[in-house]
Amino acid sequence: VANPITSGRRTALASWLTDAEKGAGRLAARVMVNRLWQHHFAKGIVSTPSDFGAQGTPPTHPELLDWLAQQFIDSGWDLKAMHRLILTSATWRQSSALREDAAEPDPHNHWLWRYPPHRLEAEVIRDRMLAVSGLLDRTMYGKGTLDEAMFRRSIYFEIKRSQLIPMMVQLNWPDTLASLDQRAVTTVAPQALLMM
């Protein structure tokens, strides 16, 4: 029910965006599950996450993408349920070890015969370092901070464009000036020095 004080345009947009029958719901669900897949596997089912149109690349596994999108819609657009579905799949739970019998016919892992190794995000690296050292403060909620010495999870870092956190930038923290569909991945000497 639209709020009588507002025009109802945002509600109409949200309804259209999630309407799988007459709106953009099917496409929105495909885009969203592709982004989730990309987050967990470092590469989406569609490798151009910001372009599902004619200029983008076609999905490597279209049936899987459609099935995941339908599961997402059927779950009531429940992100937690989608993460659980992906993370409990046999594909996610595979070893990342190289198997010669599978590598010969599919050297680029197109058929996902192994879990693809990939770099962790800056936030995950920092949080794991704090957890392993026993310093991680697991307190939830509250204000963000610019204090590099804080021991809370990295999600609580405040983003200030003029005062970025050097460690995070060194580990490919995303540029806050633009919207990115994929994070840059670099391997440079300063990253190795940072980990010493």
Positions of the model-derived regions?
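Primarily short, surface-exposed interaction patches in extracytoplasmic proteins
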Residues: 1-151, 156-158, 168, 174, ...
